[in-house]
Amino acid sequence: MPLHKSAEKRLRQSEKRNARNRARKKELKVLVKTMQKLIEASAAKPEVETAYRSVVQKLDRLGVKRYIHANKASRKKSQITRDFNTYMQSAQQ
């Protein structure tokens, strides 16, 4: 328990930020899983493209705003793009 008024405020702020950060990371996880499920289910191209764009957009935003490390965002984007490109090539054939 904080002893000072300012420490109590910092604790409240920290808890709020922590909840906000967890929510943003959870959104990203849900988007990634949705895209992976669409790829596994061999969904229509437009659906997968839309999911891919939203995942990349979310990764960029979280990386720039430092909710996740920029290198992690870049690495995840690379992995997701690789999966997306593989799916698109197999869908064409």
From Swiss-Prot:
HAMAP family in the cross-refs: Ribosomal_bS20
Renumbered residue ranges of the record's region Disordered: 1-25
GO CC field: cytosol; small ribosomal subunit
Biased composition range(s): Basic and acidic residues: 1-18
Gene Ontology biological process terms in this record: translation
Any one Gene Ontology molecular-function term assigned to this protein's record: structural constituent of ribosome
Protein name: Small ribosomal subunit protein bS20
Position of the signal peptide: none
Function: Binds directly to 16S ribosomal RNA.
Keyword entries, A-Z: Ribonucleoprotein, Ribosomal protein, RNA-binding, rRNA-binding
Alphabetical list of InterPro entries matching this protein: Ribosomal_bS20, Ribosomal_bS20_sf
Pfam families for this protein: Ribosomal_S20p
Record keyword Endoplasmic reticulum present: no
Protein family according to the UniProt entry: Belongs to the bacterial ribosomal protein bS20 family.
Taxonomic lineage: Bacteria, Pseudomonadati, Chlorobiota, Chlorobiia, Chlorobiales
Cell membrane found in the keyword field: no
